[in-house]
Amino acid sequence: MVCCGPGRMLLGWAGLLVLAALCLLQVPGAQAAACEPVRIPLCKSLPWNMTKMPNHLHHSTQANAILAMEQFEGLLGTHCSPDLLFFLCAMYAPICTIDFQHEPIKPCKSVCERARQGCEPILIKYRHSWPESLACDELPVYDRGVCISPEAIVTADGADFPMDSSTGHCRGASSERCKCKPVRATQKTYFRNNYNYVIRAKVKEVKMKCHDVTAVVEVKEILKASLVNIPRDTVNLYTTSGCLCPPLTVNEEYVIMGYEDEERSRLLLVEGSIAEKWKDRLGKKVKRWDMKLRHLGLGKTDASDSTQNQKSGRNSNPRPARS
């Protein structure tokens, strides 16, 4: 190929530019970059494994994106928003599919706004502001353009069997039934289990798959919170099995006590959690119990707290945000 060979050194700058353009058109590798595996460590837990460079921040390689994302490690360590990691990875390692190879898919505006709402107060505390490069205004709205959000991604964890709402098990998948051991809300239980969160919430929906059960609740009041940010909004409570324990009924209001998955910024509803029908009297009791627990400095609950940390994979030493 003449144009890509050594060539003659007597060409002017204009000739060189034309020559370079012709070369690029003839070299297959010069076409739009194809999808490539995600190699950014922070983003490997996300529900996509292919990305495309340059990303939305104009980084030409993932190596550059890795260096740029390091500035957010401290902020991610505060768990200020369950949407922050998803949003950052959607910007720094955008999802790439066969249908959308020409241009990376952007995160939805609502995802950015939720992340900013949860984390900007911490940035301000350390005399920083939300980065202009991550501005939400220019991002697409879900129903008006192509964008991604955590709610829009469906994972294929196996067959989707119908659920018998009266018994709480799958039909056709297994004969094994869910047996939930009831846990009563008492001061002794509250001290022993040392729950990460306590909320007053109304159950909006229970999404049931045989291997994936999620309760969607509307948070009315936050009685206790730990590392995972809890918005006064609709949130998901995740299980770690195919059973909803404790059981919940749609449209009922409960006081819910549970744990958190710190690494994935999720609230958990697992065996040992409590869900009792809401009563003002019970809410007042919980507040008194929590005050006593704080006054005792966790006292005798340290050992049980350590055990629960190991069970739920929580880290009791969050990293502060970088100043």
UniProtKB/Swiss-Prot annotation:
The keyword Cell wall biogenesis/degradation does not apply. Residues 178-298 form the NTR domain. Residues 1-32 form the signal peptide. Residues 304-323 have a biased composition (Polar residues). Glycans are attached at N49. It is found in: Secreted. Residues 33-150 form the FZ domain. Interacts with MYOC. The FZ domain is involved in binding with Wnt ligands. PANTHER family: FRIZZLED (PTHR11309), SECRETED FRIZZLED-RELATED PROTEIN 3 (PTHR11309:SF97). Soluble frizzled-related proteins (sFRPS) function as modulators of Wnt signaling through direct interaction with Wnts. They have a role in regulating cell growth and differentiation in specific cell types. SFRP3/FRZB appears to be involved in limb skeletogenesis. Antagonist of Wnt8 signaling. Regulates chondrocyte maturation and long bone development. This is Secreted frizzled-related protein 3. It comes from Mus musculus (Mouse). The lineage of its organism: Eukaryota, Metazoa, Chordata, Craniata, Vertebrata.
